[in-house]
Amino acid sequence: NFAMQAIDHIINSAAKTFYMSGGKINIPIVFRGPNGVASRVAAQHSQDYSAWYSHIPGLKVLSPYDCNDAKNLLKAAIKDPNPIIFLEHELMYNEKFELTTDKINIGEAQVAVEGKDLTIISYSRGVKMAIELSEKLKELNINAEVINLRTLKPIDKKTILDSVKKTSRAVVVEEGWSFCGVAAEVVSIIANEA
């Protein structure tokens, strides 16, 4: 949320150095910080910059949902030679999850809940809402599949498209602004490629 104080260095230095050096200089750095709505803070500390960072060539953007995503994606980010934005949702810090030994790679989404009637796609805290919604939909005999994007850039088109081809319906959940947002990009992928 104070990343805006460093945004020039993130966008114009870290993200562009590899290209400006003709591929000779890598910038292996991870910018890790809070993202999304927060509790009892001012407006400038409660917003979602996922789409904004995703617009920038040269940046990878990760947004974990649970402790497995956070642990594995952070390890992968540290090993990656590129600048990475690692967005954590403050309201998820106190959530309890079971830690597994699953390996997670940058660019791989997860089918968090299997389903056949509807695909719900989200990332970070939105996955929690999507899972809760899928449980309520079961009471109506609707089996929703939940996709945890994990990585916003590069985005896992295959997992999204495979699910939507199976269910023929999609809902995208995000906390960010709707205009030019992550949901708009996901819907564009579905409309153009499914």
Labelled PLM ranges:
Residues 1-22, 24-27, 38-40, 90-194:
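Thiamine diphosphate
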Residues 1-4, 63-65, 176-180:
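Active-site nucleophile and cofactor-binding loops and adjacent substrate-binding regions
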Residues 6-13, 48, 185-189:
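Alpha-helical scaffold elements adjacent to nucleotide-binding pockets in ATP/GTP-utilizing enzyme cores
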Residues 16, 69-73, 104-108:
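Glycine-rich, charged/polar anion/phosphate-binding loops
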Residues 22-80:
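Conserved thiamine diphosphate
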Residues 31-33, 61-65, 85-88, 146-147, ...:
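General beta-strand structural signal in soluble alpha/beta enzymes
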Residues 77, 81-83, 186-190:
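Glycine- and acidic-residue-enriched helix-capping/beta->alpha junction motif
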